[in-house]
Swiss-Prot record:
Protein name listed in UniProt: Transcription elongation factor GreA
SUPFAM superfamilies: FKBP-like (SSF54534), GreA transcript cleavage protein, N-terminal domain (SSF46557)
Function field: Necessary for efficient RNA polymerase transcription elongation past template-encoded arresting sites. The arresting sites in DNA have the property of trapping a certain fraction of elongating RNA polymerases that pass through, resulting in locked ternary complexes. Cleavage of the nascent transcript by cleavage factors such as GreA or GreB allows the resumption of elongation from the new 3'terminus. GreA releases sequences of 2 to 3 nucleotides.
BP GO annotations: DNA-templated transcription elongation; regulation of DNA-templated transcription elongation
Amino acid sequence: MAQEKVFPMTHEGKQKLEQELEQLKTVKRKEVVERIKIARSFGDLSENSEYDSAKEEQAFVEGRITTLENMIRNAKIIEDDGGSNVVGLGKTVSFIELPDGEEESYTIVGSAEADPFEGKISNDSPIAKSLLGRKVDEEVTVQTPGGEMLVKIVKIS
């Protein structure tokens, strides 16, 4: 039997997934069923684009529900040790690109809750992999899609 994948995430990240799951099960699922019902009332299903669209959305919603249930069931909550001065999951790390770049900050989270637009990067990302286990004032070479860059860690919280 294959071992289930573990999804490291913060408590906040798990709560967001639980909220999304609840919304899909209680609201979205009902909306899609209603769309299917209305589309069926149009008659012939063989050329009914509304019906096809609603069935596709239903498949997507059910797939997302299954994915979320799996992620929540296999979540491993990252405990913040509070005092660590080492970059790790759940930590926010600030760094500057050397020699004279601007400061950037990211929170390193599990892949399930990564959202670069919110400043949350996956622990599997090249930047996070380069920073994990490092300390303030360390200079680190980071692999990016645009090539290598040298950064200096200025803060971990």
